[in-house]
Amino acid sequence: MALNTPQITPTKKITVRAIGEELPRGDYQRCPQCDMLFSLPEINSHQSAYCPRCQAKIRDGRDWSLTRLAAMAFTMLLLMPFAWGEPLLHIWLLGIRIDANVMQGIWQMTKQGDAITGSMVFFCVIGAPLILVTSIAYLWFGNRLGMNLRPVLLMLERLKEWVMLDIYLVGIGVASIKVQDYAHIQAGVGLFSFVALVILTTVTLSHLNVEELWERFYPQRPATRRDEKLRVCLGCHFTGYPDQRGRCPRCHIPLRLRRRHSLQKCWAALLASIVLLLPANLLPISIIYLNGGRQEDTILSGIMSLASSNIAVAGIVFIASILVPFTKVIVMFTLLLSIHFKCQQGLRTRILLLRMVTWIGRWSMLDLFVISLTMSLINRDQILAFTMGPAAFYFGAAVILTILAVEWLDSRLLWDAHESGNARFDD
């Protein structure tokens, strides 16, 4: 018995066209964080690309023209004298008006014999932002004059995390709450300039795509075929072959399989920071003279006294001054041990922890910024005066060393310790 099946006739004509040209192939790229070699397709503007294995951002879609970056830099340069030299806060102490600005706080630190601690604050609040705007201006002028731009481009990517104007702005709020127990506070004209400078700096850093600047100024022929001998440069993120001198053909720094002496430098910085954190938390970090009496505060006791007036601000200072430094030390110690013992479990967790400490590390400088600003506000000789204690130097040095330890660690070593050939990683 035959089955009668109805015929289905399409209502619209289906047209099949042959592909007349070869589909576009992607360029081969190595991930600078996990060293995976993959094919990167062509990316349009405002599109980002991520590593298929570790999800690290390979290409950032946010990109401004150099002219727009230069305009932002010149605007920031105009704001800087007002943000640093004009009063941020006014207080009335014992019937006398006192003005506080950024430069005055750094000068008070240096004047009291601790120039190293003052230079830490100076670099993060004044030096690094000033280098940022002058570097962008150098790129703008240098591109037109045919100057060598490689050193500036190499420095810009590392400079971003040292620009800490946003953290200093939080420190202004913390210092205001600490001082309000002794005097009446009012915002100064410099505060508005400083807030504007923070906003412009944040926007500029978020749109400063150094890798795209490398592509514009020093374009290189990408690798179009897969080759395990391809290496990625950690300076400019170019994937290719080393030249005859073993250097990256684009930025001219040595092109090595792994960062040289990464573990040794990381261990040295980490152990030194552990040693410095002990006096930083045991010795007094601030000293207040009130009517001839002397009151010393460690980091913890200062947080407890701050909690009596504002528990939320005390929580912020606790996280930045105690929780973050010790968390960074514990995480980095764990990561280094996992590399030495070739741990194969929990790779995803370790990668996330490394990215976390990379982002939060700079916030530990908050305590030094609060001390710097408070020193310029309260300084009335023996009637009422505020000065920093010996722990300030140890704390600042420990924070900087932990930042350097994270920067010096080559994250690809975590993958080397893991089993080879993993296309995915999980716990």
From Swiss-Prot:
Record keyword Transcription present: no
Residue ranges, Periplasmic side: 97-120, 291-310, 372-382
Pfam families: PqiA (PF04403)
Transmembrane segments: 76-96, 121-141, 270-290, 311-331, 351-371, 383-403
Gene Ontology terms: cellular component: plasma membrane
Disrupted-gene phenotype: The letAB mutant is not sensitive to lauryl sulfobetaine (LSB), but the pqiAB-letAB double mutant is more sensitive to LSB than the pqiAB mutant. Double mutation also increases sensitivity of the pqiAB mutant to caprylyl sulfobetaine.
Membrane topology, as annotated: Multi-pass membrane protein
UniProt entry keywords in alphabetical sequence: Cell inner membrane, Cell membrane, Membrane, Transmembrane, Transmembrane helix, Transport
Cytoplasmic side: 1-75, 142-269, 332-350, 404-427
Principal place of residence: membrane
Keyword Membrane assigned: yes
PANTHER family attached to this UniProt entry: INTERMEMBRANE TRANSPORT PROTEIN PQIB-RELATED, INTERMEMBRANE TRANSPORT PROTEIN YEBS
Function: Could be part, together with LetB, of a system that transports lipids between the inner membrane and the outer membrane. Contributes to membrane integrity.
NCBIfam families: pqiA_fam
Designated name of the protein: Lipophilic envelope-spanning tunnel protein A
Upper lineage: Bacteria, Pseudomonadati, Pseudomonadota, Gammaproteobacteria, Enterobacterales
Gene it is expressed from: letA
